[in-house]
Amino acid sequence: MFRGATLVNLDSKGRLAVPTRYREMLYGESQGQMVCTIDLHQPCLLLYPLPEWEIIEQKLSRLSSMNPAERRVQRLLLGHASECQMDSAGRLLIANTLRQHADLKKEVMLVGQFNKFELWDEQTWYQQVKDDIDAEQSTQEPLSERLQDLSL
């Protein structure tokens, strides 16, 4: 399980040094094989260990290519999916097209989200956190049933 937000740097080649605390887990779970794709709703990237991505691919394969909305999701997620292999120094090369999509610069946030990571431009991440907190504090909407059961 991946959790927490960590500031990491992209080098001049677009490589991301995976924090040490995740490396052993990623080598054990996926031999360092990862898949990176776009997020459909946020200006960030999604980074999955290969076995987790394969579950997503199975779900996507069950969608109908005859349904325009389902085909669009397939096209966006699969069309942007890029395999990346962690090197011996624990670095992942993030494809240039993906870096451009999320406007990633040198400093990026690696955000653990259970079975995957999100990759955010640092400033965009901090703005998103602020916006999310503001939205939670100002919302008048009742919590969904599942959120009501979440006891923090």
From Swiss-Prot:
What Gene Ontology molecular-function terms does this entry list? DNA-binding transcription factor activity; transcription cis-regulatory region binding
Instruction: Report the Gene3D superfamilies cross-referenced here.
Output: Transcriptional regulator MraZ domain
- BP term (GO), one: negative regulation of DNA-templated transcription initiation
Write down the InterPro entries for this protein, in alphabetical order. MraZ, MraZ_C, MraZ_dom, MraZ_N, MraZ_sf, SpoVT-AbrB_dom, SpoVT-AbrB_sf
Protein location: Cytoplasm, Nucleoid
Provide one Gene Ontology cellular component.
cytoplasm
**SpoVT-AbrB domain span:** 5-52, 81-124
Q: Which UniProt keywords apply?
A: Cytoplasm, DNA-binding, Repeat, Repressor, Transcription, Transcription regulation
Assembly with partners or alone: Forms oligomers.
Purpose? Negatively regulates its own expression and that of the subsequent genes in the proximal part of the division and cell wall (dcw) gene cluster. Acts by binding directly to DNA. May also regulate the expression of genes outside the dcw cluster.
Spell out the family assignment given in the record's similarity comment. Belongs to the MraZ family.
Q: Which protein are we looking at?
A: Transcriptional regulator MraZ
Q: Which gene encodes it?
A: mraZ
